[in-house]
């Protein structure tokens, strides 16, 4: 709350491994307190204050005295892409998720990183095949058709446009045992494999 001391807020961040905290009053978002705002309000290491005086100051200063009041927020109905864009555009590492002026949660840069890893299939056991090809209609469909034809399961695909009007297509496949066999299958059908690697299961 706004009346929480910055000392308590700092302790809470440290205990929970957080860098920022939304400030709530009457169930509504009124600000944001960060490690940076607390550090700016804290006495310098070069201060002549005694440890007792510093502790007194930290326990007297309230969150409302240092919090950021102009907070960028996102609706709980927004897409992950919209949230990512807002964070990127506004150079912030956290977005309170607001519904009818009430905070229902927060999304952080760590959440974005985790979502990216999950979408890209990182940490899944199988085979990842990478193609660099012309960005034209039908390429991805052809890749998928050849994989399904072999009876394999596609865990996910990622398409990354390049600056030279080409596209990087990465496909995560389950059940492949013969790497050279699947490579030959693709290349026999005119699809050059840029890289093929086994992936191991990892907890995210």
Please identify what each model-predicted range represents.
Residues 13, 21-37, 87, 95-110:
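A glycine-centered beta-loop-beta connector
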Residues 192-196:
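Short secondary-structure junctions
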Residues 35-72, 84-88, 102, 108-144, ...:
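Tandem CBS (Bateman) regulatory domains
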């Amino acid at each position: 709350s706004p009346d929480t001391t910055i000392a308590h807020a700092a302790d809470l961040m440290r205990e929970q491994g957080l860098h920022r905290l939304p400030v709530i009053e009457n169930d509504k978002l009124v600000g944001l307190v960060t490690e940076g705002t607390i550090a700016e309000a804290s006495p310098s290491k070069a201060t002549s204050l005694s440890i007792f005086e510093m502790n007194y100051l930290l326990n007297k200063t309230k969150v409302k005295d240092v919090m950021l009041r102009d907070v960028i927020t996102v609706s709980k109905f927004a897409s992950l892409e919209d949230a990512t864009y807002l964070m990127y555009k506004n150079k912030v590492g956290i977005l309170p998720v607001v519904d009818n002026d009430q905070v229902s949660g927060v999304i952080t840069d760590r959440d974005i990183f985790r979502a990216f890893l999950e979408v890209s299939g990182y940490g899944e056991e199988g085979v990842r095949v990478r193609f660099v090809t012309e960005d034209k209609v039908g390429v991805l469909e052809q890749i998928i058709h050849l994989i399904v034809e072999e009876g394999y399961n596609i865990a996910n695909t990622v398409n990354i446009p390049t600056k030279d009007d080409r596209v990087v297509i990465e496909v995560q496949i389950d059940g492949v045992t013969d790497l050279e066999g699947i490579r030959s299958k693709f290349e026999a059908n005119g699809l050059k494999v840029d890289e093929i690697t086994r992936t191991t299961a990892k907890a995210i």
